[in-house]
Amino acid sequence: MRLKPVYATDPNLVDAPLTEVPNQWAPQQGIHLYHFPLSLDSQKVRQGLEELGVQWQSHPILLSAHQQFSPSYVRINSRCVVPTLIIDGKVTTDTINILDLLVARFGTTNKCFETSEEETELVNYWIDKAAGLFIEAL
């Protein structure tokens, strides 16, 4: 399981994604997703949660109203981006990071996630390549 995208070289960097980091300001029980309904990355995580049959609570963050900069959200995700997944008070950020965590934690109970080890490695290779692209250079 990949828990750190290729661009995160120092876990202390603000830009580094979080993986199950305890947070006193986050909801301490249950599974919570902070997301923007029209965000493609948020849609990917919602789809993953549904495909895996995970029960979760929705916390819409309205980007047009700048809710991602509210003090309560910044305490949870200092990058001020969506989506953010919280499981029992532990924060995970970055779409691919979240999906990797969900598959590892909740198993592959759905055919969408069933693959051979070779197929999984190939998919992970291309996901890492895409995550490492410097979009502004394109």
Question: PLM ranges: what are they?
Answer:
Residues 1-138:
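GST-like domain detector, emphasizing the conserved glutathione-binding G-site
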